[in-house]
Amino acid sequence: MNSYIILPLYSTSQGEKICFSKSSMNQSNAAGRNRDPYEVYIPIPSEIRNSFPAFFPEDSFELKTKNGKESFNVKTCQENHKALMSNPNSDLGEWIFNQLGLTKNNPWDIINYTQLEATGYDSVKIENIDGKYYISLMPVGSYENFVRK
């Protein structure tokens, strides 16, 4: 089994990188209830789910930052486990936004791919080291390089 995967913080639509207005980095805009401005999920694309079906545990698990200073209770969610979310939903999002130097003052503030790209990062690395999971930001283009291997 691979000891790490790289996940995008964006989606693709017709070959273009995009941050949809009501999902992933902008989950706070989704309908249904009032949401925290930092509510996000990390997309798990089908090519990752198909190539690494047993990478994530079935139940919730602890995801630590690489420096070990922060940890999040996370699990895969949504249909076909296509999203990685924290509980509460805003914990992981707040860490991601802080690391990227991006701010959302209101749930309806939308982050676009150009803003994400300008930070120099557009993906995350999730490592499984001896059954413990770690997250770190990865530079622009890392996800594409990973899936081309």
Descriptions of predicted regions:
Residues N2-Y134:
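Polyanion-binding interface signature
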Residues L137-P139:
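Charge-dense, extended regions
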